[in-house]
Amino acid sequence: MRAGYITEYERAVLIDEIGGHVTAAHSFWLFSHENPDGDSLGCALATYAALRAIGRDVKVLTTEPVARMYRFLPHHDKITHTTVLPPGLPDVIIVNDTGNFHRLGSTYEDQLTARGVGPNAKPKEPRCTLINLDHHVGNELFGDINLVDPSCAACGELFYHLLRQLKLPFTVDVAINIYAAILTDTGRFSYANTNKETFRIASDLISLGVDPYEVVDRVYNTRTPAQIKLLAKILDTMTIDGDQYYFYCQVTQEMLRVTGTVMSDTEGVVDTLKTVENFDVCFLLKEEGDGRVRVSARSNDRFDCNTFARRFGGGGHPAASGFTMRATLGDAPHLLSDALRQYRQEIARKRQPMQEPQR
């Protein structure tokens, strides 16, 4: 079963249900997807700030360090970077901006499943409630409570409604994190999913003390020389397939080594690639060094990244998605090309008109 659109009333009912658990619970673990972006980090940190303000015990857990561009976010230093979860379980686990449980990454998925949490856990641990908060169409509804609202341009919008309705403390720290979440997931309010509600929420956050210039400047206009050198190396790998109207760039472990950077320093690079004209889709292939290649995809309105990413167990939005390939960086482009060709052929067949039956 996958998520579809819900009404404002249905959203309000689910938020009230979540509120009951927030009131009753003392301990919380907050998770984002692998390689957390601005939306997922902003939501987790806003929730951390709000729950700590009412005296709850809260942990934000990630396997990767926070990307440099997000290290100005309030409470980013409270994030626990670990591959081993703390012992036991909290009263509530909140997973945000994550279309399926696998997107937590096998490191966390396996540990939680073994402790009785998640869709594949047998038996389930009844004393821990798993809350799934997301805005992606096709979310696999893996939680005990699933609040998924695809009408929200960013997960940050959903968390804005959640925190407002539950009347949790909405400090300036909360507001900055929510604003950064919305800003980054709407491409600086430029993507097609941006609407008047997005701007209304942004306006309210500014009234609470957010400096929009500072947030934009810290996220998009603060790069180190090493990051620029890395970007130059990435762009030098640009490979074009004119027949299929796509191109890709690569990030190797060697590039990271010689420039003194880490993979999180590639955050935002794929959005730069999207600005190249006359292509339906572009990909950034990132060598993880463990037999996997992580792929970020961006497209125009002629190509559905989300549907394509699902072929590899990933997902996201029609114009921006991600997935992981079990392959070497040398093999990944060929697998990608073959999958694209097959995908386009399937789409073409679906668009062919039905033939009249012969009489």
Give the label of every model feature segment.
Residues L133-I201:
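Short alpha-helices
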Residues R2-E34, G42-R71, H81, P86-P90, ...:
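Hydrophobic helix-and-loop "lid/oligomerization" segment in the mid-to-C-terminal part
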Residues T82-D144:
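Active-site cofactor/cluster-binding pocket
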Residues R71-L73, G105-S106:
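Metal-dependent catalytic neighborhoods of phosphoester/phosphodiester hydrolases
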Residues N35-P36, T98-F101, H136-G138, Q253-E254, ...:
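Short glycine-rich anion-binding loops that position phosphate/pyrophosphate groups of nucleotides
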Residues G38-A44, F101-G105:
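Short glycine/serine/threonine-rich phosphate/pyrophosphate-binding segments
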Residues L61, V92-I94, T129-L133, I145-V148, ...:
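Hydrophobic/aromatic beta-strand patches that form the interior of the parallel beta-sheet core
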Residues K78-T83, L147-P150:
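Short acidic-hydrophobic, aromatic-tinged amphipathic segments that line or gate anion-handling sites
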